[in-house]
Amino acid sequence: MKIDNMTKLAKFVKRPNRFQAYIELEGEEMMVHVPNTGRCREILLPNCTVVLREENNPNRKTKYDLIGAYKGEKFINIDSQIPNKVVYEALYNKKVESLAKYNIIMKEKTFKNSRFDFRLENDEGEVYFLEVKGVTLEDKGVARFPDAPTERGAKHLKELVEAKKSGYGAGVLFLMQMDNISEFRPHDEMDKMFGEALRYAAINGVDVMAYECSVDEKSITLTKSVKIVL
């Protein structure tokens, strides 16, 4: 998918809280919005090059969103609103082979008391619930999730198991918001409960998928599957 708004390069200064960061743009220090509540400590380092997306909204306090950063030569998109859009595009274009038979794609649909990112349906009326997780944490080609504890993430996985036991298809797709990934693993050192929930889901028939992206400052597209090590 293309990023239509104007983007600019800047220098990262600091991040006082989850939603705000200070950057230096054309010699001026200013506050920007960070559309990611994760820690991103391995990415947002002082003086690293970041990418800003201009937001033309007069009601906002900040003019820019910080949507990505360079970790050495690797560009990583950190916008938490991007993964669902990228996966929707991939589902529509039949890029996720195991889900290609589903022609109806509905966003943000409920199952009992749960809300999943996607509800898919094929011509035979078979229903599949899909949850998407964006991944920004990487070390030497190994991607991990989460980069901060997430009770909500573990809850989603257990709810997918309930959907599977009720006769529906169910899966979780981890989207690497970067390229050149050798494998994906749950980040047990950060959140053991999530790792246990992911393995529990897999044992109980929930599909676990991982895909990397072709990504640059103006676009991000799902490309190929990544090896999963649980």
Swiss-Prot record:
Pfam families: SfsA, SfsA_N
Record-linked InterPro entries: SfsA, SfsA_C, SfsA_N
Any GO molecular function: DNA binding
CDD domains: SfsA-like_bacterial
Organism domain of life: Bacteria
Segments crossing the lipid bilayer: none
UniProt-listed PANTHER family: SUGAR FERMENTATION STIMULATION PROTEIN A (PTHR30545:SF2)
Family: Belongs to the SfsA family.
HAMAP family cross-referenced by the UniProt entry: SfsA
Protein name: Sugar fermentation stimulation protein homolog
Organism: Clostridium acetobutylicum (strain ATCC 824 / DSM 792 / JCM 1419 / IAM 19013 / LMG 5710 / NBRC 13948 / NRRL B-527 / VKM B-1787 / 2291 / W)
